């Protein structure tokens, strides 16, 4: 598709997405990660499609709220390590480009200019938790959990977690989440402020609908600037560190520790 002449929103069908579903029912747009066979893990194309959907939603004045969710039993489990193992190990230049797409997706989502709600219907691991933290509000099914596994799999969780977890849950709890790599049940995630609500699965959509209905009544320009002011806390930590993280993680693709950890994880999946 050629580049548009103006910031004109499109019908989702015109965008031809393959890795996500993008739906508009004003005042709501819904972005659904749609790779359930790999627990909605990010590959390069998904990152690009997410960024483009966020751009389109930001251009559409009929859209007042954006909901982000996943298809199947996972919200998102972060990066697709199979694509990493096949393409990025021993290839820091390609990883640098991959992380650029990841960063661009996050920037588009945070700077979308309207409230966003994460509908966390399943597990959120690694970059999946970073994705829900990039949203303004989050509602989580009470049988789901959040977990970070970077220190076990050879990847520093610097795509949002090292920057934002201390803001969300405090420094000590952030270290607990990232160092121990243990599951954080939905109830604890809500208690800690990592999500806003943990609700029974049968009530998940009703709670999301309630938030969307309330948010859609607010003045859009005032909401946009309120969001921008609140984003200062996240943005300052993000912009001060993410460039360094991109370079360091790229070089880590040459490191035996990272390579061995990724290969061991992939071997365990194959054995399972």
What feature does the model see in each segment?
Residues 1-71, 93, 107:
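Conserved CoA-thioester-binding segment of acyl-CoA-metabolizing enzymes
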Residues 1-26, 181-187, 202, 206-272:
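C-terminal alpha-helix plus adjacent terminal tail
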Residues 9, 14, 19, 70-105, ...:
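Glycine- (often His-adjacent) and acidic-residue-rich active-site loop
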Residues 31, 35, 50, 68, ...:
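Terminal peptide-recognition signature
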Residues 52, 104-107, 210, 247:
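Generic recognition of well-ordered alpha-helical segments
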Residues 78, 99, 103, 126, ...:
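Glycine-rich phosphate-binding loop at the start of an alpha helix
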Residues 107-221:
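Crotonase-fold acyl-CoA enzyme core
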